[in-house]
């Protein structure tokens, strides 16, 4: 089915207000969920909203909590999220990293006691739109087996790197081949995964999203490389925030909350003039996209460039929502 942005935001707002969320908080949160969905990231927008409400109802998320700065060391700050709403807090933390970068050239905010930030790419994009390089990542509950194991002991720990090119170039990637959100998107659409995304119950690689969702044997991106990167990202976020590691979140909490996150902004224009920056970025992009194609009918893609078209299509033609997901939201 198709809905407008206003209809989608209104549905989110209604549910939030029914939980006695303050009007301004409900409006800002509904706006972020709707913008994420409008951008084409259904897995961490509309599809994730029922799960967000579940955690809100369970008390994992404290909607009136205010993040507090704990430590300030020039370009580096440490904050405690107080388990506030995840996407609103993350937006504030990247804004703070940008403020620090405007003073120091680089800004880093390490956040502890946070909630799921929904679409991590929103915060990298937020920095890149203002002309900054944006880098951020989060740890999570253990939802992926380390390489060589069957039991979940590491997080998917998504990493985002956004570059202020025209259009914005951005990598937004889980440390697994597919996020659990994308497994759900493909399952709801009745599709196999495009490449192997995990192991079946017999230990064989599989493209069946439902099987992986059930047994949790999701495949690390790049096999042992994604497993290793997940581990070091967790270590850095834990140390810089003085927060909880994947192990602590998994063993000590009843669900995924109290995670640790990193937000970095770099002001490129302190290091290079605008014309030179743009020319260098354009040369990189042209060099890549003019390579001989493996398939004449398939264009060479640059990461994140598809979001401009997805956003335009959704604004022109309406936002496609899975009927079952919409029904869940209406029932909340």
Curated annotation (Swiss-Prot):
Enzyme class: oxidoreductase
Keyword Cytoplasm: yes
Catalytic residue list: 44
Keywords for this protein: Cytoplasm, NAD, Oxidoreductase
InterPro entries per the UniProt record, alphabetical: Diketo_gul_Rdtase (IPR023689), Mal/L-sulf/L-lact_DH-like_ah (IPR043144), Mal/L-sulf/L-lact_DH-like_NADP (IPR043143), Mal/L-sulfo/L-lacto_DH-like_sf (IPR036111), Malate/L-lactate_DH-like (IPR003767)
Subcellular location: Cytoplasm
Positions with a binding annotation for NAD(+): 168-174, 224-225, 304-306
Coiled-coil ranges per UniProt: none
Entry EC no(s): 1.1.1.130
An annotated GO cellular component: cytoplasm
Reaction catalysis annotation: 3-dehydro-L-gulonate + NAD(+) = 2,3-dioxo-L-gulonate + NADH + H(+); 3-dehydro-L-gulonate + NADP(+) = 2,3-dioxo-L-gulonate + NADPH + H(+)
Domain of life: Bacteria
A Pfam cross-reference name: Ldh_2
Subunit organization: Homodimer.
Family membership: Belongs to the LDH2/MDH2 oxidoreductase family. DlgD subfamily.
Role, per record: Catalyzes the reduction of 2,3-diketo-L-gulonate in the presence of NADH, to form 3-keto-L-gulonate.
Protein's name according to its UniProt entry: 2,3-diketo-L-gulonate reductase
Origin species: Salmonella paratyphi C (strain RKS4594)
